[in-house]
């Protein structure tokens, strides 16, 4: 009785487990990284050419340093489809001839003895699964680290307040400077180890979540 009560208590507690902590804006993990401070310019000497106004004639606007920003164009589209069909059948037959004694069939109640076994088993199963996802948009991220080979680690987030809820996009990943366009943009398909998160908070997001009692009945440990 005690073990049964303990099991029921565990089931109730499992169904009451709360969902993970809601994301909040201004997360320090996604805070922009400030660029490194440059050396102070030389004091003006009266010359026509001053270091404070010098620039590289062959430089471009592409992100390449710590703290630089770059715009990622979200072009994510995935489609998956799977179909499985299984059919099996098996048929077995066994017969035992009527026994004889002294050249005559042995009978019971005038009926000859005989035995036979027939068995048939069949199984048929079909399954299919289709899934499609699409995400379009733009998000501007910050270079948080420059690797020795020149690749850039980028990270950033964007929050949008819509009525009583918030929509947010978060992105982290690694990019190659060669993939950055002249407009300082890069498609999300060129981001390695990309982690893209798009979701929302507020009343609209809350109505899409299951209540604690529904989670209890839908938990994997529910025996029925």
UniProtKB/Swiss-Prot annotation:
InterPro entries: Flag_Lring
Domain of life the protein comes from: Bacteria
One Gene Ontology term, aspect cellular component: cell outer membrane
Transmembrane segments: none
UniProt entry keywords in alphabetical sequence: Bacterial flagellum, Cell outer membrane, Lipoprotein, Membrane, Palmitate, Signal
Lipid attachment residues per UniProt (S-diacylglycerol cysteine): 16
Single GO term (MF): cytoskeletal motor activity
Signal recorded as keyword: yes
NCBIfam families named in the record: PRK00249.1-4, PRK12698.1
Functional summary from the UniProt entry: Assembles around the rod to form the L-ring and probably protects the motor/basal body from shearing forces during rotation.
Assembly and interaction partners: The basal body constitutes a major portion of the flagellar organelle and consists of four rings (L,P,S, and M) mounted on a central rod.
The protein's name: Flagellar L-ring protein
Gene for this chain: flgH
